[in-house]
From Swiss-Prot:
One of its GO terms (molecular function) is zinc ion binding. Coiled coil: none annotated. It comes from Macrococcus caseolyticus (strain JCSC5402) (Macrococcoides caseolyticum). Its cofactor is Zn(2+). Homodimer. Belongs to the RNase Z family. This is Ribonuclease Z. It comes from the Bacteria. SUPFAM superfamilies: Metallo-hydrolase/oxidoreductase. Zn(2+) 2 binds at residues 67-68, 211, 269.
């Protein structure tokens, strides 16, 4: 699995950065992509990658500001011609998202050749998709804004075939029973299958935040996360100014990941006032202030989730 940042700019695109779009590639667990926000020209950014729109199955919108949704009409309509025919797409987002999509498609006389479901979300909503758990949390911004906590399913350990053979259990269909179940009864004997497996892995916890200033719900969403993708429009300067515009300051974000024991922080939604030189300097300073691994994403940054 990997996270791919297709757009990382705050508010407006720049020559180096597009507006907000993030992809979660679920390969090899599932052969599909999820998108978090869909900024202007998102489909153009996709052309620079190996991502296939036909394998995009779910889009999660944090809020309805233009830099997070103006790419939707292009992505939705182009998907019809890029392998998406007859493949359902589900769109999640705040109240008003359905009206936005319906209006754009109607006025432009656009017709999709696949089923589109639009689910308008609220705080505390929970969904399960392919055994992946999604929790929605309300944030604090100028308009309703949400974060999404994604918990991947646990993965079972691998069979230790040598142990089974040593126990006199020959390879065959029974091995599948040992892999799937906690106990197996064979020839009148009960086996605890954990004795014949390597240790399993806990599912990764990933959190994708929309625009927000500090709020209580952030803390519960981020708790013990393996990866947090968080806006940080203000990488330095006046904390109060960032809150005036309902955005996060770097001090806010570092406090969040510290209190939540977050392992990896990916910063996006970077103000266009910061040059590449500024970002490199600030990142070096940031990494002296936290034990969490921090990276300020640029467009097409990829992070492998092991």
């Amino acid at each position: 699995m990997k996270i791919i940042c297709l757009g990382t700019s705050a508010g407006l695109p720049t020559k180096e950065r597009n507006t907000q779009t993030t992809i979660l590639s679920l390969n090899p667990l599932y052969n599909e992509y999820w998108m978090f926000d869909c900024g202007e020209a998102a489909q153009h950014q996709i052309l620079h990658t190996s991502i296939k729109l036909g394998r995009l199955t779910h889009i999660f919108i944090s809020h309805l500001h233009g830099d997070h949704i103006f790419g939707l009409p292009g992505v939705l309509t182009s998907r019809s011609f890029q392998g998406g025919q007859d493949k359902k797409l589900t769109l999640y987002g705040p109240t008003g998202l359905k009206q936005f999509v319906d209006t754009v498609l109607t006025i432009s006389c656009s017709h999709l050749n696949y089923p589109l479901e639009i689910i308008e979300i609220d705080h505390g909503d929970e969904f399960v998709i392919n055994d992946i758990e999604i929790t929605v949390g309300a944030l604090k911004h100028g308009i309703p804004s949400f974060g999404y906590r994604i918990v991947m399913p646990d993965t079972a350990g691998n069979l230790i075939k040598e142990k089974l053979i040593a126990e006199g259990i020959a390879p065959g269909p029974v091995y599948k029973e040992f892999k799937l179940h906690e106990q197996v009864t064979l020839n009148g004997k009960i086996y605890n299958t954990k004795d014949f497996k390597t240790a399993g892995k806990k599912g990764k916890k990933l959190v994708f935040f929309g625009d927000t200033m500090p709020c209580e719900n952030e803390v519960s969403l981020a708790e013990n996360a393996d990866v947090v993708v968080h806006e940080c429009t203000y990488l330095d300067g006046d904390v109060e100014l960032s809150h005036k515009y309902c955005h996060s300051h770097i001090d806010d974000v570092l406090s969040l990941v510290s209190s939540g024991s977050v392992k990896k922080l990916i910063i996006n939604h970077v103000s266009n006032r910061y040059t590449t030189k500024d970002i490199n300097r600030l990142l070096a300073e940031i990494n002296t202030k936290t034990e969490c691994e921090v990276f300020i994403a640029d467009d097409f940054y990829e992070y492998d989730i092991e």
